[in-house]
Design a protein with these regions (language model features):
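Hydrophobic alpha-helical segments, principally membrane-spanning helices and signal/leader peptides
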Residues: 10-11, 61
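Exported/periplasmic ABC-transporter solute-binding proteins
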Residues: 3, 23-52, 56-58, 63-74, ...
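Bacterial N-terminal signal peptides
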Residues: 11-22
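Twin-arginine (Tat) signal peptide motif
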Residues: 2-10
């Protein structure tokens, strides 16, 4: 039986190597387009899927999501309604250094019928007003307490709190359904049920600094794709989408210079 020539052997080796390279490249390509899991604040429920509809999203109270990530939940990206929680995760080595990706403001919402005739934040001190807020561990709950402190209304308003919810959407739902007379929510959330609630503005001087932070979760097996998602959120198109949903620019514009 004739032996195969060196040329044939070399050709076979080259073909095998080419096949291996193709398979590896295919696997790498698949990884670069992997679907990631984004844990995001409830207030981002409507906008994030519009920025990138191809990802898997878990929305909820930022504090709850942070606790789940701490316990090993399979998140690739964490987007919080404050900077405190992602900074805490970063300090523990559980996520990358967070960056601010948007800002927001708070408002008071009341049912369209407004049975208690609430017209300002000060009206929340009226006897019998049923106020619903988010819990103090939830970013919007912490911001609410800051507003009341800034307005020197903490004790006179908190006595009317009848329920503390786990995220901003739960607060909004109770007011929209008429189960409460008023609630503190983000201005962006109020717009989602404009046909069911009226909005009462919080004075600008009483507004807290509401910044949203985003980071890559350390345990993620898709860090490249997670970073690409964050880049998409920070991109010109991503920021334009955030603005279209009522969020504020990630960097507060400098005040105009006096002429």
């Amino acid at each position: 039986m004739p032996r195969p020539s060196h040329r044939l052997l070399l050709s076979a080796v080259v073909a095998a190597l080419a096949l291996t390279v193709a398979l590896v490249a295919g696997q790498a390509s698949a990884r670069s387009n992997a679907q990631i899991t984004v844990y995001a604040a409830a207030s981002l429920t409507d906008v994030f899927p519009r920025i990138d509809p191809g990802q898997k999203y878990q929305f909820g109270g930022s504090n709850t999501l942070a606790a789940q990530i701490t316990l090993g939940a399979p998140a690739d990206v964490f987007a919080s309604a404050n900077m405190t929680l992602p900074n805490q995760l970063n300090a523990r080595g559980l996520c990358s250094k967070p960056v601010v990706f948007t800002r927001n403001t708070l408002v008071v919402v009341v049912p369209k019928a407004n049975p208690k005739n609430v017209r300002s934040v000060y009206d929340l001190t009226k006897p019998g007003v049923k106020l619903v807020v988010a819990g103090p561990g939830v970013p919007v709950g912490s911001y609410t307490l800051q507003i009341l402190k800034n307005m020197n209304l903490t004790s006179s308003v908190t006595k009317n709190v009848v329920s503390q919810e786990t995220d901003v959407r739960e607060v909004l739902a109770k007011v929209a359904l008429g189960e409460a007379d008023a609630g503190f929510v983000y201005s962006t959330d109020a717009k989602t049920v404009a046909d069911k609630v009226n909005v009462i503005k919080v004075p600008a001087w009483a507004q807290p600094k509401v910044q949203y932070g985003i980071c890559v979760v350390t345990r993620s097996n898709n860090k490249t794709d997670a970073a690409a998602f964050i880049a998409k959120v920070l991109s010109k198109a991503g920021q334009a989408r955030m603005l279209s949903y009522g969020f504020l620019p990630r960097v507060k514009p400098a005040p105009a210079k006096k002429q």
